[in-house]
Amino acid sequence: MAHSQNSLELPININATQITTAYGHRALPKLKEELQSEDLQTRQKALMALCDLMHDPECIYKAMNIGCMENLKALLKDSNSMVRIKTTEVLHITASHSVGRYAFLEHDIVLALSFLLNDPSPVCRGNLYKAYMQLVQVPRGAQEIISKGLISSLVWKLQVEVEEEEFQEFILDTLVLCLQEDATEALGSNVVLVLKQKLLSANQNIRSKAARALLNVSISREGKKQVCHFDVIPILVHLLKDPVEHVKSNAAGALMFATVITEGKYAALEAQAIGLLLELLHSPMTIARLNATKALTMLAEAPEGRKALQTHVPTFRAMEVETYEKPQVAEALQRAARIAISVIEFKP
């Protein structure tokens, strides 16, 4: 005959870290209370529940309205590493939504997060980098990071996170969009030297993102001068032979800006850039062809470059009449080809 017996063990399918959330509209207010609990396990469980809820933009909006963001800011200073990890996870999920990015800006989360840049937990730092990467997808987010003076810190972290290549990618993604807004602080933080080192990475994503960052650095005159001064151009030219199309495209884009100044033109000519850029005109990537055309146009402004490109005018004439599926792509490439021809055929 069977006997009933109460076990002292939890059922095998019960997760002790999960919290029972209140029903309906009471769920978030209840979690807000538990985020402020003095009991460590209660705080941890509330954060785990929030990690699930914050995938819903409506929940982010409600959480922001009842003051959860201030509670999360406070938990970034918690002495328990798991609390900090789960708090940064909630925040990076939040930053992946437009309403969440607005919450970041409204509640000054960017600066609060920055105090964890040197957190001993790599998971915590990884969540932080992902949150910043999500935030800069809008110009206001990039401007916020710049205004808080965090660019130099991110440049430094790009150097020291050598064991975590994924973290380097997150930081580079963040820097690319920040540099597009303003490269002043970065240029004062040796960003060109740091990016030069990353161009030599064995990781193709890091090489590509570093070249893209240098493209944005080179928009300003000071950036162009530093790229020339630190001998970055020969490395960019070498990357035109990279097996990865994105790397070649971004390297050509960086050269396109760096060769605007005379020093850049002659550095690229000395590095034999013309032949490699001409090969890139046949790339399957439209942006690579456009970048290469514009870079060659810059080199044609130098007498030596113009002379070397004289025999390649038919290539550009073919681009002028080439058809593409997208009208805007056709217009951009055809216009770039026309300008290249006019510069190459210019008679001083």
UniProtKB/Swiss-Prot annotation:
Functional note: Functions as part of axonemal radial spoke complexes that play an important part in the motility of sperm and cilia.
Principal location class: cytoplasm
Similarity section: Belongs to the flagellar radial spoke RSP14 family.
Keywords: Cell projection, Cilium, Cytoplasm, Cytoskeleton, Flagellum, Repeat
Tissue specificity statement from the Swiss-Prot or TrEMBL entry: Expressed in adult cerebellum, spinal cord, spleen, skeletal muscle and some/5 out of 9 rhabdoid tumors. Detected in fetal brain, lung, liver and kidney.
One GO cellular component, as annotated: motile cilium
Protein name (record): Radial spoke head 14 homolog
Superkingdom assignment: Eukaryota
Subunit structure of this chain's protein: Component of the axonemal radial spoke complex 1 (RS1), at least composed of spoke head proteins RSPH1, RSPH3, RSPH9 and the cilia-specific component RSPH4A or sperm-specific component RSPH6A, spoke stalk proteins RSPH14, DNAJB13, DYDC1, ROPN1L and NME5, and the anchor protein IQUB.
Organism of origin: Homo sapiens
ARM repeats: 16-55, 57-96, 99-137, 139-179, 180-219, 221-260, 262-301, 303-346
Record localization: Cytoplasm, Cytoskeleton, Flagellum axoneme
Record InterPro entries: ARM-like, ARM-type_fold, Armadillo, RSP14
